[in-house]
């Protein structure tokens, strides 16, 4: 079973692909979708949508998992994050792929064992659990952690 994990952002959306077989988690690939700062919001959202669609057609995931939004004091950044998530979710819906979302503290707890873990701890555990030797960004590790959380969550039934 292939799971695509997504750490949404208008600037740098992290993505990670894992496979689950015989209760083993295997790292397949990961990366970051970067947008151009001078582009309009519409162009940025269009680019994110297009790249997510390319990932879906390339990896054909059984399930997509995404980090939930938490509303912070900076209202405008929260709104743009929600818009990025909407663009991503519309692609997932178009392909009718099984979908789940997880709060950041639930993801941290699944990976590190503590909901208040630091980003570098998540990054280290992702690399350890998935036997990743290369350097990965925090956006990639967050996306892979989200995919991992989906793999251990009981909502996903392996057929």
Curated annotation (Swiss-Prot):
Give the keywords, sorted. Cytoplasm, DNA damage, DNA recombination, DNA repair, DNA-binding, Endonuclease, Hydrolase, Magnesium, Metal-binding, Nuclease
Into which EC class is this enzyme placed? hydrolase
Q: List, alphabetically, the GO terms of the cellular component aspect.
A: cytoplasm; Holliday junction resolvase complex
Q: What positions does UniProt annotate as the active site of this protein?
A: 7, 67, 139
Q: Which reaction does it catalyse?
A: Endonucleolytic cleavage at a junction such as a reciprocal single-stranded crossover between two homologous DNA duplexes (Holliday junction)
Pfam families per record? RuvC (PF02075)
Q: Where in the cell is it found?
A: Cytoplasm
Cofactor mode of binding and number, as noted: Binds 2 Mg(2+) ion per subunit.
Q: Does the keyword Cytoplasm apply?
A: yes
Q: Which cofactor does it need?
A: Mg(2+)
Q: What is its EC number?
A: 3.1.21.10
Gene Ontology process terms (BP)? DNA recombination; DNA repair
Binding-site residues for Mg(2+) 1, renumbered to this chain? 7, 139
Q: Which residues bind Mg(2+) 2?
A: 67
Q: Which domain of life is it from?
A: Bacteria
Which Gene Ontology molecular function entries are recorded, alphabetically?
Answer: crossover junction DNA endonuclease activity; DNA binding; magnesium ion binding
What InterPro entries does this protein map onto?
A: RNaseH-like_sf, RNaseH_sf, X-over_junc_endoDNase_RuvC
* SS bond partners: none
The family this protein is said to belong to: Belongs to the RuvC family.
Function description: The RuvA-RuvB-RuvC complex processes Holliday junction (HJ) DNA during genetic recombination and DNA repair. Endonuclease that resolves HJ intermediates. Cleaves cruciform DNA by making single-stranded nicks across the HJ at symmetrical positions within the homologous arms, yielding a 5'-phosphate and a 3'-hydroxyl group; requires a central core of homology in the junction. The consensus cleavage sequence is 5'-(A/T)TT(C/G)-3'. Cleavage occurs on the 3'-side of the TT dinucleotide at the point of strand exchange.
Q: Could you describe the subunit structure of this protein?
A: Homodimer which binds Holliday junction (HJ) DNA. The HJ becomes 2-fold symmetrical on binding to RuvC with unstacked arms; it has a different conformation from HJ DNA in complex with RuvA. In the full resolvosome a probable DNA-RuvA(4)-RuvB(12)-RuvC(2) complex forms which resolves the HJ.
Q: HAMAP family from the entry?
A: RuvC
Report the protein name in the record.
Crossover junction endodeoxyribonuclease RuvC
Species in which this protein is naturally found: Orientia tsutsugamushi (strain Boryong) (Rickettsia tsutsugamushi)
Question: Which gene underlies this protein?
Answer: ruvC
